[in-house]
Structure formats: structure tokens, C-alpha cells
Amino acid sequence: MAPKTNLQISVICASNQNRSMEAHNVLKNAGYQVDSFGTGSAVRLPGPSIDKPNIYQFGYPYDEIYKELEAQDSRLYTANGLLKMLDRNRRIKRAPCRWQDQDSIYNIVITCEERCYDAICEDLYRRGETLNRPVYLINVDIKDNHEEASVGGKAILDLVNKLTEAQDKLEELFPSIMADFQSNHPKLPVLYTIHFF
């Protein structure tokens, strides 16, 4: 049964590949309407060596990235989990999207890394507060690997469930929800604030 909420939810990491897409998948499977984005200048994925990443533009389809990396070195990208991740991603949406290139309005924005949180803060300041609509901006710091993304995705679902339960009193209950979340997930440091669209 889908959660009863009117909250517009967005999850964000640097490249809209691992952490944000894991959270997107978990939230979507729980019945939430959710979007996901990256904040970087390009999509960066591990390559054959640390100094040779695979770089793509936002909007380039996950399916095409999958096919290119499979042709490049199927064994390497299967062993490091990249093909499995891209397969999941292409089942969720067409392509990675960049936060700064969209103009939708969200009630809850959850980032997975402090530099992404900072980028969203800067973007919201740049846009201005013309609509006077609050956005609850939260950073759940998740290491960028498959295992931590899985743990983080479940924790984000827990957080979104709590925020949804309190949606009618969110402004009042937001600080205590965040304090409870931090004590229940001590290995996932959080930052949070309220901005306005």
C-alpha cells in the first residue's frame, strides 16, 4: 500500500548513480513518488584505473552507459558492481539528471554527501525565495560504495517514513525527528536546515 503523502521528495548525490539511485529505488519500492538528481558538472564512474574515470554528461541514458562499459571490459565492471548498479538504474529511470538543470519544487530534499548539500543550498539561494514554500533540506552522509549505499537507502526510507507520519506538523516536529534519526543511525552523520522556494 502506497504511503499517503503529498510530499514531493528528491534524493541527490554527485552523479545520480549509486547513493541517490539506491535511495530512489528503496523509496519507489515503498510506494513513494520520488525524483533523484546529481549535482556534479558531469557523471563520473570508475574506469580501468583511478586516473582514467569514465565521464558522461547528465542526460546520457543509463542503458547506453551500461552497453558501453560492458563492451569496454565486461569482467572488470561486473566484478566491481558497476554493471549491476547501471542495470538497476536503467530499470528506474532513463538517464541521470542534474539538480541545477531542473526547476521542480520539492518539500523534502535529501542529499548523500556534504558537498551536494552545499551545492543545493547555493542553488536555492540563487533561485531566491519567491514562492515562500519551505523545503526541508537534509544531508545523510553516505560513503560512495555499494554496501554503504544499501545501508543508507534503508536509513533514508526510515527517515522519509517518519517525515511522512509528521507531515501535518513537520515544521514543529522536524528538529526532533532529525535528532531521533541521528541517535538511531549514529554512523550516518546528518546536517539539516529549512530553505524556501
From Swiss-Prot:
Subcellular location: Cytoplasm; Nucleus
Functional description taken from the UniProt entry: Component of the cleavage and polyadenylation factor (CPF) complex, which plays a key role in polyadenylation-dependent pre-mRNA 3'-end formation and cooperates with cleavage factors including the CFIA complex and NAB4/CFIB. Ssu72 is required for 3'-end formation of snoRNAs.
Gene: ssu72
Intrachain disulfide bonds: none
Coiled-coil blocks: none
Leading EC class: hydrolase
Top-level taxon of origin: Eukaryota
Species of origin: Schizosaccharomyces pombe (strain 972 / ATCC 24843) (Fission yeast)
Pfam families, A to Z: Ssu72
Known catalytic reactions: O-phospho-L-seryl-[protein] + H2O = L-seryl-[protein] + phosphate; O-phospho-L-threonyl-[protein] + H2O = L-threonyl-[protein] + phosphate
GO biological process, one term: co-transcriptional mRNA 3'-end processing, cleavage and polyadenylation pathway
Complexes and interactors: Component of the cleavage and polyadenylation factor (CPF) complex, which is composed of cft1, cft2, ysh1, pta1, swd2, pfs2, dis2, yth1, ssu72, and fip1.
GO cellular component, one term: nucleus
Protein name (Swiss-Prot/TrEMBL): RNA polymerase II subunit A C-terminal domain phosphatase ssu72
